[in-house]
Amino acid sequence: ETFAKNLSNQGTRVLWGRCYEFEHLLPYQPIAEALGPSLAGLTTEAIGQLPQWVISELERFIPDVLAGQPKSDGKPSANTDQEQMRFFAGVSHYLSMLSDSNRVLLVLEDLHWAAESTLELLHYLARHTPTSNSPLLIVGSYRPESLERQHPLMAFQRQLQGVGMALPFQLLPLSDVAVEQFLYEMSGRDKAIIPLTRRLNRETEGNPFFLVEIIKALFEMNTITLKEGAWQGDFDRISRGELPLPASIKEVIQARVHRMGETTQDALRTAAILGREFDFDLLVATWTQNEDITLDALDEMLRYQVIDEGTGISNRDYAFRHHKIQEVIHSMIPRQRRQYIHAQVAIAMEKHFSPQDETVSELAHHYLQAQNLDRSLAGKAAHYLLQAGNLAAKQFANVDAVTYYNRGLTVVPDTDQAGRYALLSAREHVYYAQGNRDAQQDDLVALWELVQDMTTEEQAEV
């Protein structure tokens, strides 16, 4: 839009059309939408300069604009292909006439929803529209992840690129600096907006659509308001709180998921439970499908751009392209099924991969999420929370260690006296290291009372 606006300010005539998901079967709809306003703005003199056969052809898909104009006396051809070529030539002639006096930019958005007839006309215009005096630039946008493998747009693009008439351009995420600059200009604020800028950078990862939609949601919630051209709000508090996940973002992600095959969707749900980053072997082990089926599912996920290969900070095989994608897919899974998959992930991790330092917190997480399925799973969660806490304490991350121990004490089964003792004892040691004598004393008292309630066998165990 900025590109088109800049050209328009420089005198370029901008024609704008858009494809719509539920109107994709309407012939030539986006091109009709683009040409309609320019036709309506033509003077009688300008219309008079158009050949009557061109007026007749244009009236086929924009009848209201040219109603009452003289028609060509030529009889329609009995050959459908010839009629179509004559129609295409009429549209081409009109665009050529517009570009004779001025530069023309034709923008067609969301071509992944374009009907095949639209692409055929667009292909003709690109190859046959003469622009002797001023250039005609056609810009089309589409979402690659929304294209089926055999979508006609793919062949259309290859054909034009093959003859040097199309130049693909991929829009990359905004850089941190670009996001900051955008927010400074939009907000009319300077240093006050810095906390929100940093948070939105992390939350959106430079995705322009996510950025704009979250900002719109903050305004709709009156969390941010506008006064005298500048944003108003407690930006520190907003940046510390939970940002909204707008319905518009959910709908876009859900629509992308629903276009995939059922098998791929099933694998995708399991992957979302595994985490932002995941390994092929663990997906196979958890999903219980063979490697070939899993690879086919992953290929489809890659094609729809919901995941990337080997891009995560943990150097795992795959990573969701954006954490919002994983978040939305995770939320689409019913609670009971979600708990079941978490349990399957944890069991697979124990069975196929020996627990290591870097995995104990993941095992604790998965067993925590699955604990309501079976009380034994809560015991497993407490066991790995203890290990995760011990690892944190070993790395002098004492605050994290206490958090793990606290969580473990809330889920350890009442019957597991030894487990409770181990968690209390470990926490007491950390409190000692922190110099938190009151908390340490409380744990020592709790340990003494726990030992008094134990049987001889339980005392021997601890």
Identify the meaning behind each predicted range.
Residues L121-Q170:
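Sensor-1/coupling segment of RecA-like P-loop NTPase cores
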Residues L98-T118:
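Conserved P-loop NTPase "ATPase switch" module shared by AAA+ and STAND
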Residues Q10, Q29-L105, A155-M165, V177-Y184, ...:
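Conserved Walker-type P-loop NTP-binding/catalytic site
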Residues Y20, G140-E145, I214-K216:
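A short beta-strand-to-loop transition that corresponds to the Sensor-1 phosphate-sensing loop
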Residues E1-L25, Q29:
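P-loop NTPase Walker A phosphate-binding motif
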Residues S8, N406, T410, D414-V462:
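Internal alpha-solenoid helical repeat scaffolds
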Residues P173-T403, G408-T415:
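Short secondary-structure boundary elements
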Residues Y142, V328, H365-A370, Q387-L391, ...:
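Tandem amphipathic alpha-helical repeat scaffolds
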